[in-house]
Amino acid sequence: MDRLSGPDLPAEEGVPCHNQDMVVWTETGDIGARLRRLAAALDSIPEAREEWPFSTDVGRLARSVRDYLLPRVENTSRPLTVVFAGPTGAGKSTLLNSIAGADVSSTGALRPTTRAPVALVAEEHADDHREIGGVECQLVTGGAPILKSMTLVDTPDVDSTETNHRIVAETLVDHADIVVFVTSALRYADAVPWQVLRRARARGTDVITVLNRISPATAGAMVDFRTRLTAAGLGDHLLTIPEHHLAPEADRLPGLAVRSLRKRLVGIASSREAHAAATLQRVTAATAAQVGALVDEIEQLIERRDEFHDELSFDLSSELEAIALHGVTAGFHEELPEAGSGLRISRWLRRNRRRPEEIPPLETRLADRLTSLVRGEMRRLVEGYQPTPRREAMTDVVDSQLATAVPSPVSEWLSFVRRIGEPQPGRQWSAEAALVDSACSGRVTAEADVLFGADAGALVERARRELVGRLQVIGAGVAAGITDLAYPGLGEVDLEGLRSAHAALVSRFALVHA
């Protein structure tokens, strides 16, 4: 941390920032706890996806709540954070040095000049500014009285070719109480800086716009820039600084060149408490609006998810109601001749008679085959469901689910079939196989008719109803799994926390214009 002994900023008569409101806090109560819950609730929201984008950058909003709102609610005496931001070559660092009256931030022709944020801070406030929004700052301490009311921060270029520099600059803008937006006659119309400018203003941050390096040849830029600011709803208050040809070793402009900006900052510093309250009020209102919009979007998304789940569940349930699995026991026993006499039926019964020790292995094979058939049919039904998103990943998820979900219900159903069959001695296997075939295919087979007689229809209906019910339970689980895949993490969202925090933000603060 560097120690700066530059000249104090003069105590000139202040000029209030153009969009400042005078506010009072009506009640804070447990707003800190509500904000912490809001940050946690925002953390619970899954990342936006192409299928359901959010209008708000949720991660950025969570950081703003945690790193901007909370510290200011808990410590209303902290100095204002004044961030100098702008495009490449706008002269931010030179301007900050000139305001400070000392060499705070490096300048030069090599771009980018400012690679890490530099904060000019009063020594007693240094700990509060080692990090801003999670971004580590290089600290330079100074003794100017204004630093008791505000910290001045130089940032990397908002349009830097290095992604990390842009992210750092945008993060600092998101955590500023005041943004001094510096651009030049050559760069004032560039698209990227305007995006940052609009976002800062949208979140309720005070913005001081500075058009640097004005010359007679570029005088038209001042008029055009002011027109653009007005059209964008940013007002027409524009500070201008003329072009100065500095010596190569010079890092500062003459004091007269930055007099209007220095005067503006001194004026804000003289009413720091009111300005901080006004800014906090506006950022709170903007945050409440963002959270409200986010709640609406998530509620709509949950509604879409529920509709998706209900439609998929209904379709699977309907398909399973009419499921027809054929040939479940093929090869396990000799089939009944199509046109047989009593003699042939007797022969068929004798040939399919199994000793008690032979039955368990047959039942195991039957369970494996039925499990395989059920998994295949369920997979076919799901793959035929057209609205299913993320089809590639879905197949793996469904296969994994079915591998664990099917075997146990199938085995339990086969045990149920054995219990209700009540076969005559020696006919246990024949009865089980006939009842399984009939229930799976949805029709009473000839074998079941022979074995169960007048009771065949009722037994088959009972077995089938039990089978379909178990399959529908599996189908419901598959539908839930596919829904989770289509809308990952949505079930973990603390929607009630979002609603509660939103209500607190709306009701706990009041704006009183003086």
Task: Tell where the protein language model's regions lie, with residue ranges.
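Extended helical scaffolds that flank P-loop GTPase cores
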Residues: 18-78, 254-257, 262-513
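Canonical P-loop GTPase G-domain recognition
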Residues: 215-275
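Short secondary-structure boundary/capping elements
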Residues: 61-65, 160-165, 188-192
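Conserved nucleotide-binding/hydrolysis micro-motifs of P-loop NTPases
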Residues: 125-126, 157-159, 186-188, 214-217, ...
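Conserved C-terminal guanine-recognition region of P-loop GTPase G domains, centered on the G4
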Residues: 137-147, 167-179, 183-237
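Conserved G1/Walker A P-loop phosphate-binding module
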Residues: 23-149
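Switch II (G3) loop of P-loop NTPases
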Residues: 146-163
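N-terminal amphipathic/basic-hydrophobic helices that include classical n-h-c signal peptides
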Residues: 1-21
